UniProtKB/Swiss-Prot annotation:
HAMAP family: RecO. The gene is recO. It comes from the Bacteria. Belongs to the RecO family. This is DNA repair protein RecO.
């Protein structure tokens, strides 16, 4: 049976001498792997459409085994993501996160839209690190690790402002409860508001978000600690971003 779907390439791995197994993320069927025969050949008609991050239309044959790619046409190749090392690193981070936290053949319609929007935002010059943090936050409910950001995670008070973020309590703590977690991250009210924005923001309405480098480092550390505790995924792209940072490859990401 032939099936045609719009999809985003999450990853592509070599298979044999000339073939690739391509993981597509589709709106209708979720994540699925297809065999692209001859895709490793330089003149292959599949060479361009099986590159990571490509958004395209794919026709594949679904038999009893691994689906076989019959045709592909790129809708958007996101050229900036292919040639800018920083943008590419964060795009890889986001696609790897989606790959790790989704199961095959389980569609999540809004996640397809989120991923496509995130790649477009990075490609057009939005702050790639902030887009990555937004996706970090939005993936938490899908991972079964939704944080409590609307009240104190301990006493449930909605009237006292948050003064800390607790990994142990999975959310904000108020001034009456901060002593209950000595490892909680102290935060300011503006930081708490930013944290909420990253969680609730509509990606279609993300404009130019200006965040200081120090604040971004703190966001990354808090979210990574939370992920390590409740989600437990290890991302190769995260390690690559850390290496880039150490080598000064993220030096364009300065305080604004």
């Amino acid at each position: 049976m032939l099936k045609k779907q719009d999809a985003i390439v999450l990853k592509s791995i070599d298979y044999g001498e000339t073939n690739k197994i391509v993981t597509l993320f589709t709106k209708e069927d979720g994540k699925l792997a297809v065999l692209a025969k001859g895709a490793k050949k330089p003149n292959s008609r599949f060479a361009a459409v099986t590159q990571p991050f490509v958004y395209g239309s794919y026709l594949y044959f679904q038999g009893n085994g691994l689906p076989s790619l019959s045709q592909g046409e790129a809708v958007d190749s996101f050229k900036e993501l292919q040639f800018d090392i920083v943008k590419s690193a964060y795009a890889a981070y986001i696609t790897e996160l989606v790959d790790k936290l989704t199961e095959e053949r389980k569609p999540t319609f809004f996640l397809f839209d989120w991923l496509l929007l995130a790649l477009r935002q990075i490609n057009t010059g939005q702050d790639a690190e902030i887009i990555a943090r937004i996706m970090d936050m939005k993936m938490l409910p899908l991972a079964g690790a939704k944080p409590e950001l609307d009240c104190c995670a301990c006493c449930r008070s909605e009237t006292r402002d948050p003064v800390a973020f607790s990994v142990a309590y999975a959310g904000f703590l108020c001034s009456n409860c901060i002593h209950k977690d000595e490892r909680a991250f102290p935060i300011t009210l503006p930081f708490a508001k930013l944290f909420r924005v990253l969680y609730y923001v509509d990606l279609t309405k993300v404009g130019t978000i200006s965040v200081k480098a120090e604040t971004k480092r703190r966001l990354e550390w808090m979210i990574r600690t939370y992920y390590d505790e409740y989600v437990g995924v290890q991302l190769k792209a995260r390690r690559f971003i850390s290496q880039l940072d150490k080598m000064g490859g993220l030096s364009s990401d300065v305080d604004k």
